[in-house]
Amino acid sequence: LYTEAMYFFQPDPYHEGAIGTASTHANGYRTAQGANIIDCSTTAVSLGALRKDSEQLYMGSKASSGTFVIQTVEDSSKLAADGYASGFYADGSYMDHSRVPYLGSYGIEFMKGGVKIPSLIGGTPWQYSGEVQQNLEYYIVNGFGNSMYRGLMLDSLKGRSVSRKGGSNQGAGREAMVIILQMIDSLSDEAKETMLSTMKYWMEQDPGFVDSLEGVENLAIKKRAREILEDSSIVAEVEPLHKSFPYMDRAVHRMDDYLFAVSMYSERTQNTEIMNDENRMGWHQNNGMTYIYDSDQDQYTDNFWNTVNPLRLPGTTVVPVNIGTGKPDSSGYAQGGDYCSDESWVGGSTIGNYGISGMSFSGAIANKAKNADGEITYAPNLKGKKSWFMFENEIVCLGAGIQNKGIDLPVETTIENRRLGTDGENVFVVNGEEIHLPIKEANIKELAEHSADVSGTEFDGAEWTHLEGNGSSAGI
């Protein structure tokens, strides 16, 4: 009786129920993809077990095993027109919603099913093949293993979820670590050794992780976490790495005491995602935004996204205008307002632990993005190229051919935009001279409407600067 309502809204795992924009679809529901089809498959398998329904068990196993694959791209030239199939790719990327890198959000939900479903159907006629297990291992090692820093999930891989109050990079990182702990003893010997070292290092860097594992359902996970921490034979380390994610238009440069990340977009991937009233000013999150993770582990966790100027994200070169915040659909929530560029030259290359990334950018909007006022326009005459050369202790950022012909609006490049300490008294040094800058206040609405006082301080002949960090070894 209690499962009838669930069965009514989801008679099979291949479709989703009539909620939000889905209510406009034929037959009242839409085809499920990626993490959503895994969630639906988990429901189907659970329904099958509770109702003793072999058809639900079969469909849940079939739908999910057909999704736990390594997605391939037969013709990359078609990505601009067709977008991506949702799921993991050979470079460790996870794509969802056609054009959005989502390893640190939907990718986590995807992998929760990768833990849950095998535990329900293992040892039954509907259990997975060995190939599915190999793919799940690949996601763990090449996806999660290269997308975190000291237990924090990289914000560049979280899509619109960065705008959520409860969606911190620490929270997402802990969810990923729980998944890894549940799977770690089923990995191959080499993968297990790598992930044991990685997990021990991450848990040591996030000492609150083990205590965060509350509830009866986490007893075994907490026990395994403590065993790893107390095992002296496991060396806690994460090797230096330069990782290019070409399918996501992302780069990760991980050294011993810092991680640098670049977030780009192209004709294949979006500038951001504005959806369900979330992330409505995320316009430039993938416009060459750069991240520096160091010993200040609260830098992007402690209210960074709801206080940073959305028009001056670090690393970006933009025309500072309000582009639009989406259009309400039948649900009443704003959707859209995000877009692709018309540029294909976006990507990178790797030599050992060094790497290069490049992005040709423009203000032209390739797809017909919409907001409440109609078709979106940004800065159609803006164009340029950005490059990042990443070495052991040095990052070189270059720009060339940057122009916005015929338009009076300025083009601004933001080198860095750091969260200061609670008193705002971080020491700022220019050419060896300590500078005391005035503290100003503004809200996001004022920034977007250009009514805030954003006048700065000019420095003539500045050759080098240093900003005191929040904690030791966190200066920039």
Regions found by a protein language model. Name each.
Residues 1-164:
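Aromatic-lined, polymer-binding surfaces characteristic
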Residues 110, 117-132, 136-476:
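Extended polysaccharide-engagement surfaces of secreted carbohydrate-active enzymes
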